[in-house]
């Protein structure tokens, strides 16, 4: 009963917030809001600098590997149970996937900073 009440409350609250956000007026964006502000002076250069695609790909790769490594954090707590074979097998599979992914990125020159 408590679970049903909590889920109903979450659904009603999220629906209410979504409908309020939908019906609120949207702020107007005009040229002065979209331009960069540098202490009252005209901007010295364009605010839209070219972004290196290589940097973006290295950043995304780092983010993916970082999130996958975060899956390894609960292993010390999982090792306290009596059946550690399943934990060790899952850990070995996860580390193997990470190693294969790193080797794939390395062979495809995804970790090279210069082009």
UniProtKB/Swiss-Prot annotation:
Keyword Cytoplasm listed: no
GO annotation, biological process: mitochondrial electron transport, NADH to ubiquinone
Domain of life, per lineage: Eukaryota
One GO cellular component, as annotated: NADH dehydrogenase complex
Topology within the bilayer: Multi-pass membrane protein
A GO MF label: NADH dehydrogenase (ubiquinone) activity
EC number per UniProt: 7.1.1.2
Membrane-spanning ranges: 4-24, 55-75, 86-106
Keywords, comma-separated and alphabetical: Electron transport, Membrane, Mitochondrion, Mitochondrion inner membrane, NAD, Respiratory chain, Translocase, Transmembrane, Transmembrane helix, Transport, Ubiquinone
Catalysed transformations (reactions): a ubiquinone + NADH + 5 H(+)(in) = a ubiquinol + NAD(+) + 4 H(+)(out)
Gene3D superfamilies (alphabetical): NADH:ubiquinone/plastoquinone oxidoreductase, chain 3 (1.20.58.1610)
InterPro entries membership: NADH_UbQ/plastoQ_OxRdtase_su3, NDAH_ubi_oxred_su3_sf
Subcellular localization, as worded in the UniProt entry: Mitochondrion inner membrane
Known partners and oligomeric status: Core subunit of respiratory chain NADH dehydrogenase (Complex I) which is composed of 45 different subunits. Interacts with TMEM186. Interacts with TMEM242.
Function: Core subunit of the mitochondrial membrane respiratory chain NADH dehydrogenase (Complex I) which catalyzes electron transfer from NADH through the respiratory chain, using ubiquinone as an electron acceptor. Essential for the catalytic activity of complex I.
Similarity annotation: Belongs to the complex I subunit 3 family.
Name of protein: NADH-ubiquinone oxidoreductase chain 3
């Amino acid at each position: 009963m408590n679970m049903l009440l909590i889920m109903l409350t979450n659904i009603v609250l999220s629906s209410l917030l979504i409908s309020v956000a939908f019906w609120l007026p949207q702020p107007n964006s005009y040229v002065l809001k979209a331009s960069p502000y540098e202490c009252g002076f005209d901007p010295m250069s364009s605010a839209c600098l070219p972004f290196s695609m290589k940097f973006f790909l290295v950043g995304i790769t780092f983010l993916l590997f970082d999130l996958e490594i975060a899956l390894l954090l609960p292993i010390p707590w999982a090792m306290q149970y009596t059946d550690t074979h399943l934990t060790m097998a899952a850990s070995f599979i996860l580390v193997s996937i990470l190693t294969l992914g790193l080797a794939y990125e390395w062979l495809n020159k995804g970790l090279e900073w210069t082009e």
